[in-house]
């Protein structure tokens, strides 16, 4: 599947659509990490890794046009993720705090995060559990991946 951890966390994915597949290769990478990985793959620093994997060592693998294109679910013309979701830098910072660091909403608000945004992200995270339960298995690369080690009530309020 094409989903990443940010999308799986907040349910920004379609059951039997982009969630359909046998393996969620980037399912444990936040969207900002996917962006960084794509930038790195196109950098000179990745040349040795690309060579070891038998990939082209010259030119771009991902490409500037793809890396700079605004993220979109592409379900309607001119749709962008930012129409429905917070900026991924802000979203991923909150998701990391809530998921990996197990911080509470009040703790995040006390640390200076926007209360409305914290409440919204917490609500999205809870309400998306039913989708995560139906997601393809993912490649675990973080200490706290979705799957058997992460469970919320499936019918969140």
Label every PLM stretch briefly.
Residues 1-157:
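ATP/NTP-dependent adenylation/nucleotidyl-transfer catalytic domains that generate, transfer
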